[in-house]
């Protein structure tokens, strides 16, 4: 951003007083990196630390940020404030050093709240669909020429970034309930896509506590703000009378203010009508598959309609929507002659979904778009606590595929829990008699084991939130073909 643009922005959004150098602990995470990127473009000096380089840290380095691939006390020297990821423990040496030096230490959401303070904030919350809905709202506002700032938890593929600094007063951001830090945000508009039991350790295992936290989040809206809520979700429907703000509902339900009708899916596109109160019916072509994405689009349209955005801009944005990274991400279609000698081909899809509801939605989208394909899933459970808490739900959902390969649980720092491991989950699924799971204990063998179950007319879903995305990219690079050893190559 040039000096003239920065001065124009300052007239809209005052800078943080006396803050010059902002240090991020855990800067490589998508949410942290996105905020750092916006602040770097606003002219702040950015530094940060993480354990290893990734595309987020590479992008920030190109913007002039100083990145350390270690955690040392000296990294926070001269920082005005330290921003910490929820994944970072209190005994991290940089956090300890910041406290000793009386440097303010704040959570990611507190910094996001500062970015939002002087802007028209639109926050997207909910157990599932936040990232895609944030991208859809951002795409519509950009198509309408409103040049929003956005901060997303996933890569917005059309922009090639997780976050972008716009020149207008609009800020569109994903709001994270995992550590309840979204309570720091004070948006003008808030979307809640759905509410399910997840991250229950934050809420002391009390679902009522989780529900009340969402109510408190919505009551951060000003009295003239608006809550946009999915009435199809039974928990949201239950909570509606407790929300003391203006509400727009959306969903497939007959009483939704923005109603999805006549949904059908052709390949990777959804086609449906959106019926709005006192507005023209929209005939939507959405470049994203699945009924769940139609709901995400309905939420985005509800917000855009409230803002008075032109219908044609809305329709163009949805039809050209490029999606987000690792959300039903098409990585290619590969001939099987080079994989296992069989005629035919296999499509490869990478998806971040790691909760049973998300996995179910991905499977349904795959079945609806490609009903004749042999559906093969390579799945990596994420966290032992989630596997334990949702064990039966995972077992039920994963029986819907034709072939299932399962990696070990990605621990995300958790200690193993007996009975909540992949071997136990495979045993339970096998006992239900619908699919015979294959346990992939060594990720290096994933390609070879995957090749053994391909039939010649396959759709391969690589599913999970841990490091399985790297495996998906590797499978795409080798075009699903297992790499032969020297002995195999030379007979």
Swiss-Prot record:
One of its GO terms (biological process) is cell wall organization. InterPro entries: Mur-like_cat_sf, Mur_ligase_C, Mur_ligase_C_dom_sf, Mur_ligase_cen, Mur_ligase_N, MurCDEF_pg_biosynth, UDP-N-AcMur_Ala_ligase_MurC. One of its GO terms (molecular function) is UDP-N-acetylmuramate-L-alanine ligase activity. Pathway: Cell wall biogenesis; peptidoglycan biosynthesis. It catalyses: UDP-N-acetyl-alpha-D-muramate + L-alanine + ATP = UDP-N-acetyl-alpha-D-muramoyl-L-alanine + ADP + phosphate + H(+). It comes from the Bacteria. ATP binds at residues 126-132. This is UDP-N-acetylmuramate--L-alanine ligase. It comes from Klebsiella pneumoniae (strain 342).
């Amino acid at each position: 951003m040039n000096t003239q643009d920065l001065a124009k922005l300052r007239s809209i959004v005052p800078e943080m007083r006396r803050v010059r150098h902002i240090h991020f602990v855990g800067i490589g995470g998508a949410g942290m990196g996105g905020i750092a990127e916006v602040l770097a473009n606003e002219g702040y000096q950015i530094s940060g630390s993480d354990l290893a380089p990734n595309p987020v840290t590479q992008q920030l380095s190109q913007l002039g940020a100083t990145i350390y691939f270690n955690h040392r006390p000296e990294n926070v020297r001269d920082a005005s404030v330290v921003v910490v990821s929820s994944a970072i423990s209190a005994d991290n040496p940089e956090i300890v050093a910041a406290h000793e030096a009386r440097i303010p230490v704040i959570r990611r959401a507190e910094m996001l709240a500062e970015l939002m303070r002087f802007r028209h904030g639109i926050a997207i919350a909910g157990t599932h669909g936040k990232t895609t809905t944030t991208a859809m709202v951002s795409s519509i506002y950009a198509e309408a020429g409103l040049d929003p700032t956005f901060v997303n938890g996933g890569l917005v593929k059309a922009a090639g970034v997780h976050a972008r600094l716009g020149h207008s007063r609009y800020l569109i951001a994903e709001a994270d309930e995992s550590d309840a830090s979204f309570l720091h945000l004070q948006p003008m508009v808030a979307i809640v896509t759905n509410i399910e039991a997840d991250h229950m350790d934050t809420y002391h295992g009390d679902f009522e506590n989780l529900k009340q936290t969402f109510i408190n989040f919505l009551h951060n809206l000003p009295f003239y703000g608006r809550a946009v809520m999915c009435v199809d979700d039974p928990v949201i429907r239950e909570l509606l009378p407790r929300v003391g703000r203006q509400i727009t509902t959306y969903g497939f339900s007959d009483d939704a203010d923005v109603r999805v009708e006549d949904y059908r899916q052709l390949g990777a596109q959804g086609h449906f009508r959106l019926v709005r109160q006192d507005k023209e019916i929209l005939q939507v072509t959405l470049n994203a598959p699945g009924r769940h994405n139609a709901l995400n689009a309905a939420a985005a349209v509800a917000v855009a309609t409230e803002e008075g955005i032109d219908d044609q801009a809305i329709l163009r944005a949805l039809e050209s929507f490029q999606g987000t990274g690792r959300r039903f991400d098409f990585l290619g279609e590969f001939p099987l002659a080079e994989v296992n000698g069989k005629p035919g081909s296999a499509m490869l899809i990478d998806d971040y979904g790691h909760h049973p509801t998300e996995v179910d939605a991905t499977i349904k989208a795959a079945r609806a778009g490609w009903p004749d394909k042999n559906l093969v899933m390579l799945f990596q459970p994420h966290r032992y606590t989630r596997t334990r808490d949702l064990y039966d739900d995972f077992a039920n959902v994963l029986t819907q595929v034709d072939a299932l390969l399962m990696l070990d649980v990605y621990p995300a720092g958790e200690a193993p829990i007996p009975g909540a491991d992949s071997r136990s989950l495979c045993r339970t699924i096998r006992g239900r008699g619908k699919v015979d799971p294959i346990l992939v204990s060594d990720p290096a063998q994933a390609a070879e084991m995957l090749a053994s179950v391909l039939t010649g007319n396959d759709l391969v879903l690589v599913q999970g939130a841990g490091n399985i995305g790297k495996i998906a990219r590797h499978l795409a690079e080798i075009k699903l073909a297992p790499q032969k050893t020297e002995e195999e190559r030379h007979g």
